[in-house]
């Protein structure tokens, strides 16, 4: 899961330790809470409703893995509200059915739920056949199923490595190849979208299995963007930065210690929201993006460029300190 697929469910009106200014908004039946400590966040308010015109996906079929919660649920909600017939899949059928019923009642479009463990190629094969049976060949395929946990790499067991790579890399491959074969047979195109993470490109300590697997997912999608365009398929990638969802943060920031640090290194001054990611995802999967293929879109409020700049930490220097520094620089030889 992207180091952080998150906008988190909290049934609170105020936390015991008041974190400063807050924004509350609703998503489905849940209340989401987000800290907005950084003053500049007021310049970057999130838009929480679909940006595409109504019925942008009318008559289209969308298949979303990991569609029962978090980012997957948000993307499914937006696609359904824009007219798509959605089919969601994951291992937990009870959560899937509840989400499908919730979105169906909200949008008026039937959402189907299919239990699927993407680690099992036989189950993936049967799921794709059921998808085609209940809804037809998909026009949109979103590979969102993921798994992650933090651990020093020297503490990793072979099973820990295998658990993550089986879900993220192998699972994405099984779904993509199986659906691709069916689409080629039917002579039908589709838009594929993979949800990865900003550290798929840079790498990251303490999440090495996820970083490695997500990097593989990106290579896979870029390879297929080149190879399967001739069949009417295009492939794009979103690299989310910190988007707080309960599921991801329970494993990646279980103590809540790192959230403030995250916000401090995001130039936009806040975490992202699931709705913002859903807007980007629906655009990339829509006909409005028909000439976007093989793209990797970083969606992180500027976090990656801040972290990669050698001198970006100088933002903490005050005006008075800059006056002193400037005076010292002017006294150096060659100034």
Curated annotation (Swiss-Prot):
A single cellular component GO annotation: catalytic complex
Transit peptide location on this chain: 1-34
Disulfide bonds: none
Substrates-to-products reaction catalysed: a (2E,4E)-dienoyl-CoA + NADPH + H(+) = a 4,5-saturated-(3E)-enoyl-CoA + NADP(+); a (2E,4Z)-dienoyl-CoA + NADPH + H(+) = a 4,5-saturated-(3E)-enoyl-CoA + NADP(+); (2E,4E)-hexadienoyl-CoA + NADPH + H(+) = (3E)-hexenoyl-CoA + NADP(+)
UniProt keywords, alphabetically: Acetylation, Fatty acid metabolism, Lipid metabolism, Mitochondrion, NADP, Oxidoreductase, Phosphoprotein, Transit peptide
Keyword Lipid metabolism attached: yes
PTM sites of type N6-succinyllysine: 42, 49, 73, 97, 106, 244, 260, 319
Primary location recorded for the protein, binned into one broad class: mitochondrion
Family: Belongs to the short-chain dehydrogenases/reductases (SDR) family. 2,4-dienoyl-CoA reductase subfamily.
Protein name (record): 2,4-dienoyl-CoA reductase [(3E)-enoyl-CoA-producing], mitochondrial
């Amino acid at each position: 899961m992207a180091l952080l697929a998150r906008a988190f469910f909290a049934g609170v009106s105020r936390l015991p330790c008041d974190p400063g200014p807050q924004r509350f908004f609703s998503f489905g039946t849940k209340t989401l809470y987000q800290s907005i400590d950084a003053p500049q966040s007021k310049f970057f308010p999130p838009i929480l409703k679909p940006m595409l015109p109504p019925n942008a996906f009318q008559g289209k079929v969308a298949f979303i893995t990991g569609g029962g919660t978090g980012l997957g649920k948000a993307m499914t909600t937006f696609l359904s509200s824009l007219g798509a017939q959605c089919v969601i899949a994951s291992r937990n059928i009870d959560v899937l059915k509840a989400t499908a019923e919730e979105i169906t009642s909200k949008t008026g479009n039937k959402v189907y739920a299919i239990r699927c463990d993407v680690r099992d190629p036989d189950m993936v094969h049967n799921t794709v056949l059921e998808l085609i049976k209940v809804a037809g060949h998909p026009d949109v395929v979103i590979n969102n199923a993921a798994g992650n946990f933090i651990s020093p790499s020297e503490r990793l067991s072979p099973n820990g490595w295998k658990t993550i790579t089986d879900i993220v890399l192998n699972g994405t491959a099984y779904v993509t190849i199986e659906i691709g074969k069916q689409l080629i047979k039917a002579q039908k195109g589709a838009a594929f979208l993979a949800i990865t993470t900003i550290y798929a490109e840079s790498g990251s300590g303490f999440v090495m299995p996820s970083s490695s697997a997500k990097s593989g997912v990106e290579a896979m999608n870029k390879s297929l963007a080149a190879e399967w365009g001739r069949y009417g398929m295009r492939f794009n990638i979103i690299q989310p930065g910190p988007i707080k969802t309960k599921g991801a943060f329970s494993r990646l920031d279980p103590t809540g210690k790192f959230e403030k640090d995250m916000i401090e290194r995001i130039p936009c001054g806040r975490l992202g929201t699931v709705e913002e990611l859903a807007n980007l995802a629906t655009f990339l999967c829509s006909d409005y993006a028909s000439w976007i293929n093989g793209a990797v879109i970083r969606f992180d409020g500027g976090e990656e460029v801040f972290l990669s700049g050698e001198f970006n930490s100088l933002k903490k220097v005050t005006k008075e300190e800059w006056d002193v520094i400037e005076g010292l620089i002017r006294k150096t030889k060659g100034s």
